[in-house]
């Protein structure tokens, strides 16, 4: 092969390669519009324009794929549909539904893996049409909260740094405004921080923080003077007084409960106290006739001149102590009485 033929062959190979590359990257070179979606919700994607929908009757095959990037050569098949077979999808990925009447793809519950570039191919007898879109999912923002980072007070004026914070949300944008103001406040670099210099004329000023992303927005209002004014110590005193008042009520209730408990215990003690018995005092008295004190022989027991008298006397018994209960006892008294001689 001469040099001229070899050069012609090289030109043909280059042209064939360029043609193949242009065909392979045709979808990636399309202008794919971005469609925002709310994460976790049901989404419906319109995969074709009105002009393409009108030519759907001429199509014989529909293919929908998804790729992580527009230039990615590997795509995941989502829907494969042959129109002559009655419109029933030959293949349908789990979590999707395809509506043939308007060429829309429905995602039942969107997740992060559903993000990406969706391509739809309409094959006709002698032509092929392409359509694409980019699905971008965002988490819905939560209600913001305004916090006071720091504040200083001097000569009746107050300088304060506010921070607007959210717990959830993707690509969050912060904006500040005054509730009764016309122009929005412009923090540095559209930050979530806002620096304020307040005076007595700003007592009723209310500031609003708004957070937003492509699928949601929330706002929260705040009156900073309530945190900055010197009179802010008054509510603290009221809280202290309220706490003392409640503590006093609780103390009175506790004392009342203790008194009731003591009264109940005393009533039970009186109920079970045994019946008191009178003390019996036994007095032994001996009576003897007067006479000679000369010593006589011991008389027989039957002639004993002494007569013993037993007298039982009863006296009031003093109230004993509640505890312990003492058993009743007897006191014996011995007395000697001498009769004169007759």
UniProtKB/Swiss-Prot annotation:
This protein's record includes keyword Kinase: no
InterPro entries linked: CD2/SLAM_rcpt, Ig-like_dom, Ig-like_fold, Sig_lymph_act_molc_N
Instruction: Indicate the transmembrane segments per the record.
Output: 238-261
**Cytoplasmic-side segments:** 262-342
In the record, Phosphotyrosine modifications are located at 284, 310, 334
Q: Which GO terms describe its molecular function?
A: identical protein binding; SH2 domain binding; signaling receptor activity; virus receptor activity
* Sequence motif ITSM 1, location on chain: 282-287
- Cellular component terms (Gene Ontology): external side of plasma membrane; phagocytic vesicle
**Pfam families referenced in this protein's UniProt entry, alphabetically:** SLAM
- Every Ig-like C2-type domain range: 144-223
Q: Known Gene3D superfamilies for this protein?
A: Immunoglobulins (2.60.40.10)
- Name the principal localization, coarsely classed: membrane
Outline the extent of the Ig-like V-type domain.
Answer: 29-138
Q: Where is this motif: SH2-binding?
A: 310-315
Domain of life from the UniProt record? Eukaryota
Q: Where is it localised?
A: Cell membrane
Q: Which residues carry attached sugars according to the database record?
A: 57, 102, 125, 150, 157, 189, 217
Q: How does it assemble?
A: Interacts (via cytoplasmic domain) with SH2D1A and SH2D1B; SH2D1A mediates association with FYN. Interacts (via cytoplasmic domain phosphorylated on tyrosine residues) with INPP5D and PTPN11; presence of SH2D1A facilitates binding to INPP5D. Interacts with MAP4K1. Interacts with PIK3C3, BECN1 and UVRAG; indicative for an association with PI3K complex II (PI3KC3-C2). Interacts with canine distemper virus HN protein; suggesting that it may serve as a receptor.
Entry's free-text remark on domains: The ITSMs (immunoreceptor tyrosine-based switch motifs) with the consensus sequence T-X-Y-X-X-[VI] present in SLAM family receptors have overlapping specificity for activating and inhibitory SH2 domain-containingbinding partners. Especially they mediate the interaction with the SH2 domain of SH2D1A and SH2D1B. A 'two-out-of-three-pronged' mechanism is proposed involving threonine (position -2), phosphorylated tyrosine (position 0) and valine/isoleucine (position +3).
What is this protein's function?
Self-ligand receptor of the signaling lymphocytic activation molecule (SLAM) family. SLAM receptors triggered by homo- or heterotypic cell-cell interactions are modulating the activation and differentiation of a wide variety of immune cells and thus are involved in the regulation and interconnection of both innate and adaptive immune response. Activities are controlled by presence or absence of small cytoplasmic adapter proteins, SH2D1A/SAP and/or SH2D1B/EAT-2. SLAMF1-induced signal-transduction events in T-lymphocytes are different from those in B-cells.
Stated name of the protein: Signaling lymphocytic activation molecule
**Which organism's genome codes for this protein?**
Canis lupus familiaris (Dog)
Query: Which taxonomic lineage is given here?
Result: Eukaryota, Metazoa, Chordata, Craniata, Vertebrata
| Gene transcribed to yield this protein | SLAMF1
């Amino acid at each position: 092969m001469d040099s001229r033929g070899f050069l012609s062959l090289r030109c043909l190979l280059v042209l064939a390669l360029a043609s193949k590359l242009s065909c392979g990257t045709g979808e990636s070179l399309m202008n794919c519009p971005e469609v925002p979606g709310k994460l976790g919700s049901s989404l419906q994607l319109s995969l074709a324009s009105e002009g393409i929908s009108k030519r759907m009757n001429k199509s014989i095959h529909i293919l929908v794929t998804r790729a992580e990037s527009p230039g990615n050569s590997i795509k995941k098949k989502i829907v494969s549909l042959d129109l002559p077979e009655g419109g029933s999808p030959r293949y349908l990925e789990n979590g999707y539904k395809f509506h043939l009447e308007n060429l829309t793809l429905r995602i039942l519950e969107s997740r992060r893996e559903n993000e990406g570039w969706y391509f739809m191919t309409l094959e006709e007898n002698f032509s092929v049409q392409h359509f694409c879109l980019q699905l971008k999912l965002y988490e819905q923002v939560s209600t913001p909260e305004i916090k006071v980072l720091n504040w200083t007070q001097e000569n009746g004026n107050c300088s304060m740094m506010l921070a607007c914070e959210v717990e959830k949300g993707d690509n969050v944008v912060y904006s500040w405004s005054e509730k009764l103001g016309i122009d929005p406040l412009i923090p540095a670099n559209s930050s979530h921080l806002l620096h304020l210099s307040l005076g007595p004329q700003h007592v009723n000023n209310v500031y609003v923080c708004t957070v937003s992303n492509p699928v949601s927005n929330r706002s929260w209002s705040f009156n900073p003077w309530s945190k900055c004014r010197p009179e802010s110590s008054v509510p603290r005193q009221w809280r202290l007084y309220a706490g003392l008042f409640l503590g006093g009520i609780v103390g009175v209730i506790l004392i009342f409960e203790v008194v009731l408990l003591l009264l109940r215990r005393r009533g039970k003690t009186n109920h079970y106290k045994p019946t008191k018995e009178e003390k019996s005092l036994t007095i032994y008295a001996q009576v003897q006739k007067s006479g000679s004190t000369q010593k006589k022989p011991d008389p027989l027991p039957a002639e004993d001149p002494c007569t013993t008298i037993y007298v039982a006397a009863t006296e009031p018994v003093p109230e004993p102590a509640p505890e312990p209960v003492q058993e009743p006892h007897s006191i014996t008294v011995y007395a000697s009485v001498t009769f004169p001689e007759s």
